[in-house]
Amino acid sequence: MKMWKRRGQKKSMFLSSLLVCCMFASAEYSSCGEYEFFNQTSNSCQACPQCRPGQEPNMSCGHGMKDEGFACVPCPQGKYSKGKYEICRRHKDCNALYKATVREPGTAEKDAECGPCLPGYYMLENRARNLYAMVCHSCQNAPLNTKECKKTTEAIIKPPINPGSTTVLPHPGSPGQGHLATALIIAMSTIFIMAIAIVLIIMFYILKAKPNGQACCSGQVVKAVEAQTNKLEDKKDVPDNVVIFPEKEEYDKLKASPQKTVKSENDASSENEQLLSRSIDSDEEPTSDKLRSSEATNHNLCQANVGYKPDLCLLSLGLLDHRVVCNGTPASAGSQANNTQAPNHITSSNVSSMNAINNNNKTPGMLQSRRKKILDLYARTCHVTEGLSPTELPFDCLEKASRMLSSSYSSDAAVVKTWRHLAESFGLKRDEIGGMSDGLQLFERVSTAGYSIPDLLARLVQIERLDAVESLCADVLGSNEIVALVGRQSVNSFHSQLVCPSPCTSPSPRCASV
């Protein structure tokens, strides 16, 4: 028995000593920094070897561990690195992505630098002219007075002619091309004639199968004329002292569809202004004089019954700036006090006036100032996040941007681009885009390819998604600076019943810490 007790004591002592050694070893490894490894010879943490510019580490080193065979290897062709512990990144593709010329080609130690736009492309003047804002657009959508596009059209219209020669020789063409053009014209003419003949035959059989069509139509006309004459006779029979309320005629007028807004045919920025009008309020609060005038001219709006319209949050945000109030009471109280008309009749007669107020509030000047502020935020964010990849942002920031890019809706000018259009702007193939489910996978893919946060913002500007640019800039710069620059206005309790709440009113502390 004593022998067994001694053996048990020896085993327990051995296990306890082994646990103590493991605890000391783990404590020593955990005390090392991000780019340090634990040297068992010197029993201390040492810094990992740094690579020179144009090189990258082939193994991992840091947090107390160092892989065997750690060394610095040169960057492959088409990539660059600034040295130390940075991996090699791909050079900027000025021609394919930015549609610009190459000012300085990229080397193994620095990135490529883009120059002016390619022939047939131009750059908007109201955008920041920095390294990451060199986004050129096609001259097909350019205004008439664009200088870069004028040069291209003049070069096409006025080809160079030798002043010494007085005759212009035609271009020699092969006889085979002439015969091919003739055959193509004959084939197209034959197809066109056959199509016309088929249409005429079908129309002939349709008219032959329905011989009583004209009689039916003439009978309908006769019935309509008789109905009008009967109405006139009924009106004549009514005495003069009887008052007739034309409720049906007024109701028919109210049921008429509102006029469609005229689309702007300006440059590519007009489409973005129409998109921004869905998500912004007016930047300036109306004065008391404007409030009095709006109460006098739009007093019918105070009769809108909010209780009968739970989906009034889909109305334009222009109602927030007008603050429709009658004698200190909200619109719902006005509708309850007035019992002369039905609620459905009141609301149907006021929807068109609400849309008219919304269209008057969102003037082009407000949209331009809003666009300028967002582009200023974009330029500042590019300066702050230079060299950072998108995956270095917190997960909740990337998830919010992915949700914004996943929602697709149509505006008056164009269809809002989604993350799939963003992937196409990065040059990804459709097969690869089809394998992705959301924007988070796209952010991880472009980060692996070596693109940075400014590159991502530049693509968002290129596809006209300034709302996503504003969201990412707000997450990076923080809420205080965004409030000072953009100046959003607060909403009182009554108007909060009319507007759907925003999914993310302010960036989280994790986003603002970037």
Curated annotation (Swiss-Prot):
Ranges for the TNFR-Cys repeats: 31-72, 74-114, 116-149
Q: Outline the segment boundaries, as ranges, of region: Disordered.
A: 254-294
Q: Name one GO cellular component term.
A: plasma membrane
Task: Give a GO molecular function annotation for the protein.
Answer: signaling receptor activity
Summarizing the annotation, the consequence of altering residue 155 to P is: In strain: HNI
UniProt-annotated location(s): Membrane
Pfam families, per the entry: Death_EDAR (PF24979)
Keyword hit for Acetylation: no
**Topological domain spans for side Cytoplasmic:** 205-514
Domain Death, by residue range, is 403-476
Write down the membrane topology.
Single-pass type I membrane protein
Functional note: Receptor for EDA. May mediate the activation of NF-kappa-B and JNK.
Query: What is the name attached to this protein's record?
Result: Tumor necrosis factor receptor superfamily member EDAR
